[in-house]
């Protein structure tokens, strides 16, 4: 931590707190995310960090390094100054079809790259898509599941509190193909960009999880009359929102769909992507062995308060305490969310009985 200065808090996600820091020597801004040491550091955390390290794509937040603090495992990654795509939609209300396509094309390219490496995201949503600060923003996928997999593999932030992005097969509690589920979530993201609302929520009763889940299972959605989109766009959505995941459109088919191909930026063409991989030689300086060693040490619970005091300044102690408090608050929100979804699933099962 000695080489970074804290700039500000960025918020909280599935796993804890994120902060903006500046490298003291290079002045580069980075995002740092904290996971509490001890029981939360399991094989899932190790696997996902290694997975993220291997991802080198312009539409994916770049992993930089992991650092062990007295109380947390800190993950350092690229900072996207444009904020969440979610916030951009909240400000705009909804996007034009052209703008929605622009971001959807980038999302699909990033997800397709992950899938080519046999990595599924399982938590794709607007809050997990960031933007850089350029005038024509570059979309960046983030949050590759740094916490234990939940029963649904998808936990919206408490500020959203909806299972709206979750595919039917995930709700069924049976084994499912994460790639198919990612495609469904991409479809929900596209719908929200176009409409400014979730496809399977009852607009008059948005917090009714039971009703939302029933609508997801029945693929019950519609495009409001006030939203004017092309037939090609409607067709693509209808091919994504298919209950039987085996019959759902694949990423390869999406990338050949007429609506997707319209005004496709040249940097998203297959040839341009291949050139990017050859040109981009930057990677994490930490070896897999170094990362695994740090993660292994992080499995040991945080030292006692006295040990923390002897290892750092008062400012560091305050920072660690703040992170811990925010993480605990977020955990409570997640537990409450999971409880509601379990209740909704039980209702769904009782309806079938």
From Swiss-Prot:
The active site is at residue 123. GO terms for molecular function: ATP binding; kinase activity; protein kinase activity; protein serine kinase activity; protein serine/threonine kinase activity. GO terms for biological process: protein phosphorylation; response to osmotic stress; response to salt stress. Residues 315-336 have a biased composition (Acidic residues). SMART domains: S_TKc (SM00220). CDD domains: STKc_SnRK2. InterPro entries: Kinase-like_dom_sf, Prot_kinase_dom, Protein_kinase_ATP_BS, Ser/Thr_kinase_AS. This is Serine/threonine-protein kinase SRK2G. The lineage of its organism: Eukaryota, Viridiplantae, Streptophyta, Embryophyta, Tracheophyta.
């Amino acid at each position: 931590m000695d080489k970074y200065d804290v700039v500000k808090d960025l918020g909280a996600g599935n796993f804890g707190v994120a902060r903006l820091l500046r490298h003291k020597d290079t002045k580069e801004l980075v995002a740092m995310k904290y996971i509490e040491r001890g029981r939360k550091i399991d094989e899932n955390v190790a696997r996902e960090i290694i997975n993220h390290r291997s991802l080198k794509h312009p539409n994916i937040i770049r992993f930089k390094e992991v650092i062990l603090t007295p109380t947390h495992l800190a993950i350092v990654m690229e900072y996207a100054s444009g904020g969440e795509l979610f916030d951009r939609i909240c400000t705009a209300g909804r996007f034009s079809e052209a703008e929605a396509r622009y971001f959807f094309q980038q999302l699909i390219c990033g997800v397709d790259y992950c899938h080519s490496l046999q990595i599924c995201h399982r938590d794709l949503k607007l809050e997990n898509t960031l933007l850089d600060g350029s005038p024509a923003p570059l979309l960046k996928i983030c949050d590759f599941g740094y916490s234990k997999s939940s029963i649904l593999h998808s936990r919206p932030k408490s500020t959203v509190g909806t299972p709206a992005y979750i595919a039917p097969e995930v709700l069924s509690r049976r084994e499912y193909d994460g790639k198919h589920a990612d495609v469904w979530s991409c479809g929900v993201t596209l719908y929200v960009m176009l409409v400014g609302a979730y496809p399977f929520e009852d607009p008059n009763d948005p917090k009714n999880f039971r009703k939302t889940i029933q609508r997801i299972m029945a693929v019950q959605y519609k495009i409001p009359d006030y939203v004017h989109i092309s037939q090609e766009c409607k067709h693509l959505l209808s091919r994504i929102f298919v209950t039987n995941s085996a019959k759902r459109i694949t990423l390869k088919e999406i990338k050949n769909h007429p609506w997707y191909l319209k005004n496709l930026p040249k940097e998203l063409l297959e040839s341009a992507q291949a050139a990017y991989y050859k040109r981009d030689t930057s990677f994490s300086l930490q070896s897999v062995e170094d990362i695994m060693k740090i993660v292994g040490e992080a499995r040991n619970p945080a030292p006692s308060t006295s040990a923390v005091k002897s290892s750092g300044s008062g400012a560091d102690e305050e920072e660690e305490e703040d992170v811990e408090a925010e993480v605990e608050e977020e955990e409570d929100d997640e537990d409450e969310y999971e409880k509601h979804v379990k209740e909704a699933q039980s209702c769904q099962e009782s309806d079938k009985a």
